[in-house]
Swiss-Prot record:
PANTHER family: LEUCYL/PHENYLALANYL-TRNA--PROTEIN TRANSFERASE, LEUCYL_PHENYLALANYL-TRNA--PROTEIN TRANSFERASE. The keyword Transferase applies. GO terms for cellular component: cytoplasm. This is Leucyl/phenylalanyl-tRNA--protein transferase. It holds the Pfam family Leu_Phe_trans.
C-alpha cells in the first residue's frame, strides 16, 4: 500500500524513531529505524583545533532557517541521492509549520554550505549536509551543536554513522536505548527558532 508523505506523517514517524529515504528521484519511499542508531552526545561532540580556528575567524555568516528550500535542494544535488522531489516538497511543508530547520553558512552573500533537519521537542533529527566551500558544512554543524546545547536539547540524531561524522565523535547506540532517549527528549519544551 502506498501512503502519501505528509508533514503529519513525518512527525508521527519521527516520534516513533522512523525516518524516510527514497531510492533515487521519483522512486519509492522506504521507512528506516536503524539498529544501532547514530547519535551525538551534545556535551561530547569533538571539533578539531583547526576547525575551531576557522570558526574564530568568522569567515562565514551563519543563518538559521532562512533558506531551507535552497539547503535541501543543495543536499539533494548529487549523482546519487535518497532525497527525492516528494521528500523535498514534504520537508518544505514541514519547514513552513516550524518543524523543519536549516543551519546555513554564507560567504560574500552566497549560500556555500549547510544542513537541514527536524526539531521536535528536545530532539533534533539531522537529515543531510552540503558543502561548496571548504569547512562550510562543518562550521554550520558547529553552530547547530551550540544552538542545541544553548536551548536545552537532549538528542541529536544523525541516523547512520559514516567516516565524515566519526571526526566529531558520533556514537552508535542500541535501538532500545535510542527509543528511551527519544521519549525523554520529545517531552522537553525546546524551541529551535
Amino acid at each position: 500500500m502506498l501512503v502519501t508523505l505528509t508533514p503529519e506523517l513525518l512527525l508521527q514517524a519521527y516520534t516513533q524513531g522512523f525516518f524516510p529515504m527514497a531510492e533515487g528521484q521519483g522512486q519509492r519511499i522506504y521507512w528506516y529505524e536503524p539498529d544501532p542508531r547514530a547519535v551525538f552526545e551534545l556535551d561530547k561532540v569533538h571539533f578539531s583545533k583547526r576547525l575551531l580556528r576557522v570558526i574564530r575567524q568568522e569567515r562565514f555568516e551563519i543563518r538559521y532557517s532562512t533558506a531551507f528550500e535552497r539547503v535541501i535542494r543543495a543536499c539533494a544535488d548529487r549523482p546519487s541521492t535518497w532525497i527525492s522531489e516528494e521528500i523535498i516538497r514534504t520537508y518544505i511543508r514541514l519547514y513552513r509549520t516550524g518543524y523543519g530547520q536549516s543551519v546555513e553558512s554564507w560567504l560574500d552573500g552566497e549560500l556555500v554550505g549547510g544542513l537541514y533537519g527536524v526539531s521536535l521537542g528536545g530532539a533534533f533529527f539531522g537529515e543531510s549536509m552540503f558543502c561548496r566551500v571548504s569547512d562550510a558544512s562543518k562550521v554550520a554543524f558547529f553552530h547547530l551543536v551550540e544552538r542545541l546545547r544553548g536551548r536545552g536539547f537532549a538528542l541529536l540524531d544523525t541516523q547512520f554513522a559514516n567516516e565524515h561524522l566519526v571526526q566529531f565523535h558520533v556514537v552508535e547506540i542500541p535501538r532500545r536505548e535510542y527509543r528511551q532517549r527519544l521519549k525523554g527528549a520529545l517531552a522537553l519544551p525546546c524551541k529551535f527558532r
